[in-house]
Amino acid sequence: MPRSQKNDNFIDKTFTVLADIVLKILPTSKEEKEAFSYYRDGMSAQSEGEYAEALENYYEALKLEEDPYDRSYILYNIGLIYASNGEYVKALEYYHQGLELNFKLPQALNNIAVIYHYQGVQAIEDKDTELSKLMFDKAAQYWQQAIKLAPDNYIEAQNWLKTTGRMRNIQGY
């Protein structure tokens, strides 16, 4: 087994043990603990590329989780899976649902921008300049929001915004 895989397994096992301890000692309801358990299992399955299993766990977690902040991360992870599978419309739906519950989720804003940027590139390949401009403008809007929340992140997006003349309304620019 490669060293990096051993380290990953060690980290996964350590996380699982710590999560189990936290679940036992936190003063939370049975439903909250069960929701977290499903969420944790979903993250584990997702990291192993077992997307169908991850989705099952995330959907179970959504049924039980009541906290909007926690639900936003479950929805975000579901969006990640759909994006990984090339199902961009579904991914966008879940990212937006996550943002409705937690507007301070820069990674969701970034991923929405990435999808719109990809669609802009596809439109160029299809020689649809009007659609490409629309998609690139949408990407710019979401990247600007992500950068406002996390100014030290998304350097490639910041460079793209600058080089395309779309960098505006961001503090310091």
Swiss-Prot record:
Protein's organism: Pyropia yezoensis (Susabi-nori)
NCBIfam families per UniProt: PRK02603.1
Function comment: Essential for the assembly of the photosystem I (PSI) complex. May act as a chaperone-like factor to guide the assembly of the PSI subunits.
HAMAP family linked to this entry: Ycf3
Record key words, sorted: Chloroplast, Membrane, Photosynthesis, Plastid, Repeat, Thylakoid, TPR repeat
Homology family: Belongs to the Ycf3 family.
Protein name: Photosystem I assembly protein Ycf3
Gene: ycf3
Organism phylogeny: Eukaryota, Rhodophyta, Bangiophyceae, Bangiales, Bangiaceae
A UniProt-annotated Pfam family: TPR_1
InterPro entries: PSI_Ycf3_assembly (IPR022818), TPR-like_helical_dom_sf (IPR011990), TPR_rpt (IPR019734), Ycf3/AcsC/BcsC/TPR_MFPF (IPR051685)
TPR-type repeats, residues: 35-68, 72-105, 120-153
The keyword Chloroplast belongs to this UniProt entry's keyword annotation: yes
GO biological process, one term: photosynthesis
